[in-house]
Amino acid sequence: MKNIITPRVFIAATRQNDGKTTTSLGLLSAIKRYYPRVGYIKPVGQRFVDVEDHKIDEDSFLMDKVFRLNCPLPEMSPIAVASDFTRKYLKSSNNPKLVKRVQQAFDRVAWEKDFVLCEGTGHAGVGSVFDLSNARVAKILNAKVILVTQGGIGRPIDEVALNQALFEKDGVEIIGVILNKVRQDKVDYISEFARKGLERRGLNLL
């Protein structure tokens, strides 16, 4: 990867369906107020649509449609995990080729951009079977992480701790945690105690 200058952040979650894509939509909207030229990449995608003979991750397609990012769609979605992807990988590993694909895609997405938002797939360990876990991809992209988890205190912080261990193992910094799907009448209560629990782990509640 040649681009180590363009600011970037990697959005991950403690589990699937925690609201990572919704969070990414909100963050991109906010970021564009300060950085008009924003790029987006979902390095590893599991659900995709066919666009001009390319398999494009659904979230990449959505972001481009909403924000008109002026990024090449195939580079926003460099690796599409089809049903036979893992089986083929385990038969004949081609990890260096996949890593290079991710790096080159990022460089193209980041070209003449002020900021790039990178979105992961599920929790930190997803993708480990083909050696491209979210933690490793964040490391490859030299990106710090914002972790999204569901509202609550006990279980979310337990899950954050598990994910934190995986990211730290790869030397990736978590810059903050977003609590999603919190009931309106519980926001103040959960925020107070979740913040205390996260601070004990050296993490910030955003």
Q: Language model features by range: what are they?
A:
Residues 25, 103, 107, 157-161, ...:
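Amphipathic, non-transmembrane alpha-helical secondary structure
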Residues 32-37, 65-72, 107-111, 165-172, ...:
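Generic secondary-structure signature for well-ordered alpha-helical cores
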Residues 86-130, 135-138:
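Phosphate-binding/switch loop-helix module in NTP-utilizing enzymes
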Residues 3, 7-18, 22-101, 108:
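N-terminal phosphate/diphosphate-binding loop that engages ATP/GTP or pyrophosphate donors
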Residues 7-11, 113-118, 145:
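Generic beta-sheet signal
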Residues 120-205:
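Conserved catalytic-core segment of NTP-binding enzymes
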Residues 13-15, 43-44, 76-79, 119-122, ...:
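Fold-independent oxyanion-binding glycine-rich loops
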